[in-house]
Amino acid sequence: MRRVQTEEPTLAPAIAARLRRNDAGLVPAVVQDAATGDVLMMAWMDDVALARTLATRRATYWSRSRQEYWVKGETSGHTQHVCSVRLDCDGDTLLLRVDQVDGACHTGDHTCFDADVLLAEEVES
């Protein structure tokens, strides 16, 4: 059987030129639930992770601790189907709107921001 080789997707030069990366070549990606508007998590992307995400609509990130790419949900089943990707006005932050399957956080919580509320909304009496 002949194996088909697939080419690694590359980031369009026009998009790459607009990105403002940190010293490690990374851009923060804020991830939002497309259905609820909840902010789910923040992860890091480089050009390869962004290109893979744009090509597949599967959220792909760069792990700073493991020094490798990871596709959200590949091992947990808690996948993110990417509905849209936006670049902020300064070009230094991405916004991914996703259809999230189960919890987005590695703890199993719906979002990575469920656990520690530092300042809650005021309740009028």
UniProtKB/Swiss-Prot annotation:
The keyword Protein biosynthesis is assigned to this record: no
Pathway participation: Amino-acid biosynthesis; L-histidine biosynthesis; L-histidine from 5-phospho-alpha-D-ribose 1-diphosphate: step 3/9
UniProt: Mg(2+) binding residues: D88, D90, D92
Enzyme class, UniProt record, top EC level: hydrolase
Coiled coil ranges: none
KW Lipid biosynthesis (keyword) present: no
A molecular function (GO) term: phosphoribosyl-AMP cyclohydrolase activity
Cofactor binding note from Swiss-Prot or TrEMBL: Binds 1 Mg(2+) ion per subunit.
EC numbers on record: 3.5.4.19
Binding sites annotated in the UniProt record for Zn(2+): C89, C105, C112
Keywords tagged on the record: Amino-acid biosynthesis, Cytoplasm, Histidine biosynthesis, Hydrolase, Magnesium, Metal-binding, Zinc
Superkingdom, natural source: Bacteria
Main location: cytoplasm
Subcellular location: Cytoplasm
Biological process annotations from GO: L-histidine biosynthetic process
One Pfam family, short name: PRA-CH
Cofactor: Mg(2+); Zn(2+)
Catalytic activity: 1-(5-phospho-beta-D-ribosyl)-5'-AMP + H2O = 1-(5-phospho-beta-D-ribosyl)-5-[(5-phospho-beta-D-ribosylamino)methylideneamino]imidazole-4-carboxamide
One CC-aspect GO term: cytoplasm
Record text on subunit structure and interactions: Homodimer.
Function (record text): Catalyzes the hydrolysis of the adenine ring of phosphoribosyl-AMP.
Family of the protein in this entry: Belongs to the PRA-CH family.
Protein name in UniProt: Phosphoribosyl-AMP cyclohydrolase
Gene (name only): hisI
